[in-house]
Every structure is written in C-alpha cells, then in structure tokens.
Amino acid sequence: MDTVLKPLGVKCSGVFLDLGISSPQFDDGSRGFRPEQDGPLDLRFDITQGVPASDFLKKVNRDELVRILHEYGETTDPVAARRIADAVCLAVAEDRLPSTTKAFASLVASAKGKEYQAMHPAKLTFQALRIHLNQEFDEMRRGMRAAAEVMMDGGRLGVLTVSLCFLGLRPLSRIFQSRASDDTSCREPPHTHNRGGNNDPHNT
C-alpha cells in the first residue's frame, strides 16, 4: 500500500485486511506446516526468505527457544516449553535433529509426555515456530500501519482474523485502541472478533 498508493497520493475511505492463512500452503506437505503430514521441516510462507525451521533450530539457543515456545505457543505451562527446548538442544548436540515434520513431531511428543496429549502434541510447537519464523505479528502491525497511512480522515479499517490464533488478537486490539485514542475522528470504539475461536484450525 505504501509503495503503490502513497506515491500516487491516493487516499482510501476504507481498507480491508484478510489475515487468514492460506489453506493451499497448509495442505501442501512439502511446506512442513502440519505435524501429522510428512515433509521437510520448513514452516515458511515465503521459501525465498529466511531459513527453514530445521536450520533455525540448529542455531537458536535454549533460552530463546523457550521464550518462543512460551510466547507464541499459547501455553501457560513453562515446564512443557523447557522440556521441548531441552530435547531439541540435545538432539542438535548429538547431531540427530529431525529434518522432517513427522519425526520432529515425535521428538516433541516424547519431550512433552503423556499428560500433555489432549491435542496433537506438536500442534502448539509448530504454531510457535511458524509465527516466529514468518514474523507474523510484525507483518500484521506493518500492514495496519500502512493501511492507516493511506486512509482519509474518518476512514474505516476492517480486519478478518478467521484463522488467526487467539494470541494474535492481543496486539491487534492494542493497535485499534491506540488508533482510536490518537484519532479524534474515531466516533465508534474498535471491535475485534475472531470467528475461528481460540485455536488455529490449520495446525490440528
């Protein structure tokens, strides 16, 4: 938006952002998004940018991995995050870190233990790594800032978050609230609604 519309001096009365996840990408086993599908452990939306998850895990330190799993994995149990991080770091040290999704999911399942098996044991780990590798929340913030720059006074910004995990609604709500408090033209309070519920359906 800022590279196309802004130089043209175009102002929009409304902008709609679809933050939903691409089902074709998730359904493609070669992209490594689903723990139950076998494929390379990649987890990138744009395979021309950054490094695959298998390479990232070989370089990240334990404390940073614990933070990523805890912050982006929608878990309030720090013990689970530490168990997974320890298992990954040990596998890296012993040169046996899996490079495929199913094998990595098995490693995560073994680390978490049976008491954590209410859902697919690797679901939240895959989600956390995906969010971090793709900088999903940073991209969301950049998109909303760019939209605000091209909107005219009193313009409306709509955001569809059908597939956005629950924790993504927090920064989204803060951005809306910040815009509402800074912009006197906002006559209505911002509303956020996630039709997808609290879980990311693409990782089930």
PLM features: residue spans?
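S-adenosyl-L-methionine-dependent methyltransferase catalytic core, i.e., the SAM/SAH-binding region
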Residues: 1-204
